[in-house]
């Protein structure tokens, strides 16, 4: 099942959380959900070149807080903050509520699955060989600390008559292990031969903070190290 399902959705409530964080009555839920979709589509369309990874939407009472995670925050902010203020006003009109806009910089875009997928899609649109684009992304991710990465490219790759899927993997990507920190991203490349899809999985290690066994082991290690240091003092 882990091979088929979206790995982020599989880990919700385990080591991942939702990108829309709000509660609403049954009558308002549908409207706010569609509003979130419109906000995301608009922001992604406006900030195509800003390497946007994800958009988190929170809704305090009669307000809206939008957080954009980007590898190029300078492109969003603009000269003296002019661009970000223009974007904030537009989002306020869309939500009909007081909207605040936060920008969070991604310091390692080479291991962010969504940004990797967007980069490969842009290279495919520029007619870069898909194998070269995939291999370059894999090498960069492993060099920056990823423990494993898998990339799928599908469509009429290289202008072939018959569509196919090619994939490349380095390291390990444990999709069934819930405590594994697996990032997942997709993108589309609109080429002259049609649309090519790109999927990226990045394994960044295991998250053990939520594992009760891991916390017990850490506590035991602390007790063991403390008793060892006490014995050394007594012997001295």
Curated annotation (Swiss-Prot):
Q: Which InterPro entries match?
A: KH_dom (IPR004087), KH_dom-like_a/b (IPR015946), KH_dom_type_2 (IPR004044), KH_sf_prok-type (IPR009019), Ribosomal_S3_C_sf (IPR036419), Ribosomal_uS3_bac-typ (IPR005704), Ribosomal_uS3_C (IPR001351), Ribosomal_uS3_CS (IPR018280)
- Keyword rRNA-binding among UniProt keywords: yes
Q: Report any one BP term from Gene Ontology.
A: translation
Q: Please, which domain of life does this record's source organism belong to?
A: Bacteria
Q: Where is this region: Disordered?
A: 216-236
Q: Where is the KH type-2 domain?
A: 39-107
Q: Which CDD domains match?
A: KH-II_30S_S3
**SUPFAM superfamilies linked:** Prokaryotic type KH domain (KH-domain type II), Ribosomal protein S3 C-terminal domain
User: Pfam families per the record?
Assistant: KH_2 (PF07650), Ribosomal_S3_C (PF00189)
List GO molecular-function terms, semicolon-separated.
mRNA binding; rRNA binding; structural constituent of ribosome
Its keywords, alphabetically, are: Ribonucleoprotein, Ribosomal protein, RNA-binding, rRNA-binding
**Entry's transmembrane regions:** none
Sorted alphabetically, the Gene Ontology cellular component annotations on this record are:
cytosolic small ribosomal subunit
Biological role stated in the UniProt entry: Binds the lower part of the 30S subunit head. Binds mRNA in the 70S ribosome, positioning it for translation.
Instruction: Describe the subunit structure.
Output: Part of the 30S ribosomal subunit. Forms a tight complex with proteins S10 and S14.
In the record, the note on similarity to other proteins reads: Belongs to the universal ribosomal protein uS3 family.
- What is this protein identified as? Small ribosomal subunit protein uS3
The species this protein belongs to is Bartonella henselae (strain ATCC 49882 / DSM 28221 / CCUG 30454 / Houston 1)
């Amino acid at each position: 099942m882990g091979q088929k399902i979206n790995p982020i959705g599989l880990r919700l409530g385990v080591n991942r959380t939702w990108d829309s964080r709000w509660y609403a009555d049954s009558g308002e839920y549908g409207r706010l959900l569609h509003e979130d979709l419109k906000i995301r589509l608009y922001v992604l369309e406006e900030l195509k070149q800003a390497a946007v990874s994800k958009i988190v939407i929170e809704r305090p009472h009669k307000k809206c807080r939008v957080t954009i995670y980007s590898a190029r925050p300078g492109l969003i902010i603009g000269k003296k903050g002019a661009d970000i203020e223009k974007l904030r006003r537009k989002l306020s009109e869309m939500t009909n509520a007081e909207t605040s806009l936060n920008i969070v910089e991604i310091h390692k875009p080479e291991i962010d699955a969504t940004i990797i997928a967007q980069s490969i899609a842009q290279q495919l649109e520029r007619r870069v060989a898909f194998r070269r684009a995939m291999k370059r992304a894999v090498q960069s991710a492993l060099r920056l600390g990823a423990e494993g990465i898998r990339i799928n490219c599908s469509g009429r790759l290289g202008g072939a008559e018959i569509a196919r899927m090619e994939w490349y993997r380095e390291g390990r990507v444990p999709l069934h292990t819930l405590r594994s920190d697996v990032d997942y991203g997709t993108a589309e490349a609109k080429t002259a031969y049609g649309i090519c899809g790109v999927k990226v999985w990045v394994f960044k290690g295991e998250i053990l903070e939520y594992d009760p066994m891991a916390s017990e082991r850490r506590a035991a290690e602390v007790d063991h190290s403390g008793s060892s240091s006490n014995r050394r003092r007594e012997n001295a």
